[in-house]
Amino acid sequence: MRNVTFRQLRTVEAVCRLGKINLAAEALGLTGPALTLQIQHLERDAGIALFDRTRGGMVPTAYGLAFLEAARAIEDSLIALEDSIDAIKGLRTGRLRLGVVSTGKYFAPQLIAAFRDQVPAVEINLFIGNRAEIIAKLRDHEIDIALMGRPPRDFEVRAQVFGDHPLVFIAPAGHPLAGVLEISRERIAQEQFLVREKGSGTRISLEIFLSDTPHELEELGTEIASNETIKQAVIAGLGIAFISAHTIEQEVKLGRLVILDVIDTPIRRQWFTVSRLDRVATPAMQAFERFVLASGARYLPVVSKPYPANAFG
């Protein structure tokens, strides 16, 4: 296997990513027959099958996935090498592929802007998605750093805390539970909920919180994949929600939403910077992690009281 070239690995990566020989060939500037020949030679030399040929396209085998992992790791190393050379030259440049869970989009722009003020030459490509999507991109080497809660456990990562992440129950102004003190879990579970989709970190936290009550989330309410839509639905009186306090600062200050005083809330989770443990940290990654660990918490809204309209200090 030592004779495998990076060009061959890139061929495997393109076929894995695009699923079709013709699409991979077009992306690489090759003809379909030429790319097919490369794959066949590689399979013959290694004595393995890299792909299953199906009607739906090329599906990587376990061997193909191992080649894909190697290709992405080498690509990461080449990016790190390029950034390191720039750093040795004294150039404060580089690229950073940043993934942020959807809850983080309420503070990430301010944090990124502050970082760019300090290191303006670093190019940042931002991806926003739910927890499952961010983890998938981190696993597949498609992002360098993630800002998220609850780091993944199915592969090794470097996770560092940079701030608190409070989760709260919200209701529309005028709701019967607004202003009620020490609401029990059993009482809150009787309400109609607006919940995030499966795979969301907020939903996982809610499921854990209500695990001692005889209810399933599917029985409690409606699934909505957007924090913004959830907030508007709560304001309209369609139900209550469990949500990151960092997403509701303006609505609470304006009196459109209230934070309910449910016993054992706010639930205090944490925000992490997360990167693959086997990932070579580029100078751009190192600079961003240093900045977030030193200054990231100041961009997070602080919940000073559990309720009502003056909950944010």
Curated annotation (Swiss-Prot):
Annotated source species: Rhizobium meliloti (strain 1021)
This protein's record includes keyword Transcription regulation: yes
Keyword Transcription included in the entry's annotation: yes
Residue intervals of the HTH lysR-type domain: 1-61
Family matches, as Pfam families: HTH_1, LysR_substrate
Keywords of the record: Activator, DNA-binding, Plasmid, Transcription, Transcription regulation
Gene: cbbR
Family of this protein: Belongs to the LysR transcriptional regulatory family.
Family matches, as SUPFAM superfamilies: Periplasmic binding protein-like II, Winged helix' DNA-binding domain
Role: Transcriptional activator for the cbb operon for RuBisCO and other Calvin cycle genes.
TM annotation in the entry: none
Protein's name according to its UniProt entry: HTH-type transcriptional regulator CbbR
DNA-binding region of this protein: 21-40
Record InterPro entries: LysR_subst-bd, Tscrpt_reg_HTH_LysR, WH-like_DNA-bd_sf, WH_DNA-bd_sf
GO terms, molecular function: DNA-binding transcription factor activity; transcription cis-regulatory region binding
Superkingdom in the source lineage: Bacteria
Gene3D superfamilies noted in UniProt: Periplasmic binding protein-like II, Winged helix-like DNA-binding domain superfamily/Winged helix DNA-binding domain
